[in-house]
């Protein structure tokens, strides 16, 4: 395929119940494309050791925090793309992505975020989602993931119950207008100075960051690099050294089938082990 982007393959068991492994499906797809379609193979991206191996031996426990994992990958694959969006203007190698993460971490600190604080992300599959997660983990904050389909009562409950201090959000998704929703929950926002929100219904929320439109009372994503200049990188590194693999780094809310949604607290170790089992 003469295509510079990427192809995603989805294997759904119900479509082929006689197959018990996606390991059968994907090689057969590659063989078909090679036999019947004009293809162009790309060279394998080698690691810095020239081995092409995994960063860790398979079946080995990843005993590191997320910042340590990112540093390891940057060292081994300095020229490999971490992100290459086809429709959004965001292409970064791993070291370039880490630089963006560090700058966002500095901006969070400049806004008053501290180790243990909760930062919520209300967005789809955009670069800001990943940057927010990795920046939060770098300074010991907890990322609160928000369902993109949430309506006003659901997001208000989550932000209040999670004690979120900073919210990063896109403008809208499908029929949910996030800006309208947050202004309805926090009518004080439009008259507030960015970073100094004092909302009666969400007393812990101080910072709202918009990724697209500029909204009164909110920081805009493009302004964050200037805010980051107020904090030296050494402060990020100082906090990073205090983070333990058993520290909570992510709060995911349940669906609330039998009651109100509950926040599930996940540590660096929980997630790295879960991902290792999923892709290993």
Q: Where on the chain are the PLM-derived regions?
A:
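AMP-dependent adenylate-forming
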Residues: 46-47, 69-93, 212-216
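Conserved AMP-binding/adenylate-forming core of the ANL superfamily
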Residues: 62, 79-134, 151-156, 220-229, ...
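Conserved small/polar residues in nucleotide/adenosyl-binding loops
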Residues: 254, 276-280
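Structural core segment of the AMP-binding/adenylate-forming
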Residues: 139-226
């Amino acid at each position: 395929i003469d295509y510079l982007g990427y192809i995603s393959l989805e294997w759904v068991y119900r479509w082929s119940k006689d197959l018990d492994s996606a390991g059968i499906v994907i090689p057969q797809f590659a063989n078909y494309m090679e036999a019947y379609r004009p293809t162009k193979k790309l060279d394998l991206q080698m690691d810095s050791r020239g081995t092409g191996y995994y960063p860790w031996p398979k079946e080995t426990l990843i005993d590191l925090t997320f910042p340590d994992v990112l540093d390891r990958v940057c060292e081994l694959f300095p020229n490999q793309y971490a992100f290459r969006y086809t429709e959004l203007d965001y292409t970064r190698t791993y070291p370039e992505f880490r630089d963006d993460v560090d700058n966002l971490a500095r901006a969070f600190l400049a806004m008053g975020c501290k180790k243990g604080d909760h930062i919520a992300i209300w967005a789809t599959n955009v670069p800001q989602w990943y940057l927010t997660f990795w920046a939060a983990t770098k300074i010991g904050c907890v990322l609160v993931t928000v369902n993109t389909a949430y309506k006003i009562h659901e997001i208000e409950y989550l932000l209040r119950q999670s004690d979120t201090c900073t919210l990063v959000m896109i403008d809208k998704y499908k029929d949910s207008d996030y800006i309208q929703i947050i202004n309805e929950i926090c009518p004080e926002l439009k008259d507030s100075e960015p970073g100094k929100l004092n909302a009666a219904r969400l007393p812990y929320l101080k910072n709202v960051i918009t990724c697209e439109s500029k909204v009164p009372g909110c920081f805009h994503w493009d302004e964050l690099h200037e805010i980051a200049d107020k904090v030296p990188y050494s402060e990020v590194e100082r906090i990073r050294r205090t983070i333990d693999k058993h520290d909570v780094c992510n709060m995911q809310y349940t669906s609330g089938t039998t009651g109100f949604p509950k926040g599930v607290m996940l540590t660096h170790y929980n997630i790295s082990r879960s991902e290792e089992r999923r892709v290993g």
